[in-house]
Amino acid sequence: MDFKYTEEKELIKINNVMIHKYTILYTSNCILDISFGEDKITCFNNRLVFLERGVNISVRIQKQKLTEKPYVAFRLNENVLRHLKNTLMIIYGMSKIDSCECRGVSRKIMTTEVDKMLLNVLREMMGHHNDDSSFISALIYLISKIKCNDKIIESLYMSSITFFTDKVRGVIEKDLSRKWTLAIIADVFNVSEITIRKRLESEDTNFNQILMQSRMSKAALLLLENSYQISQISNMIGISSASYFIRIFNKHFGVTPKQFFNYFKGG
């Protein structure tokens, strides 16, 4: 992710945002512009946005009320995604999907307006965010009330597929404080470094990209928790110098950790 901070404090531009978990956004307090390749989607206030895992997007966020958070985000962990996908397959079924097929933006990023009924379901989901079973039930009900939900179901199915990149990221994220190298990853998978490199290249990525994305994404989430000092976050993601972490964060996102936190913290 590459964040560009503007002098207009209600506006932030973010490039190269990699969606590591299937994400549902509710634009409760913002207008959200999403760019995916040459395509652009504008999501006004009070809309739901479904983001497929693995997409790389750029966004422009403009708050309506400066003191509040711009949106509500639901990020589905592996367990929730798996159970949700299995249940939806039983309810709706699904014709054979080719994971290698070229799929356009309309099948990876979907939006819908939120009426009063959907808003009530969203509130229920917020109340059950720490209860997987109740959260999944509420989410299934929400999806059932969305017209033309077949693309959402297909996207959830695609997001449940595990690629080699996911396996490498999973190993790294178990201990981001470790000084990871390609050689260590090769030992974990009991293969050569060349094999690791080629398999990642076949998925259009490399070890350094995965490591940096994992560290910076975790740092951003830790900042939003507002529970740790900069020096603590730096150590937690494997960077020993706090000042170096600030420089890397600023280079990667385009804003300092403080600017990032202040924009997203809300009232």
Swiss-Prot record:
Disulphide linkage map: none
DNA-binding region: 183-204, 230-253
Keyword Transcription: yes
Keywords: Activator, DNA-binding, Plasmid, Transcription, Transcription regulation
Entry annotated with the keyword DNA-binding: yes
Pfam families for the chain: HTH_18
Source organism superkingdom: Bacteria
PROSITE patterns named among the record's database cross-references: HTH_ARAC_FAMILY_1, HTH_ARAC_FAMILY_2
InterPro entries xrefs: Homeodomain-like_sf, HTH_AraC, HTH_AraC-typ_CS, Tscrpt_reg_AraC-type_HTH
Single GO MF annotation: DNA-binding transcription factor activity
Quaternary structure and partners: Homodimer.
Function comment: Transcriptional activator of fimbrial genes in enterotoxigenic E.coli.
Full protein name: HTH-type transcriptional activator CsvR
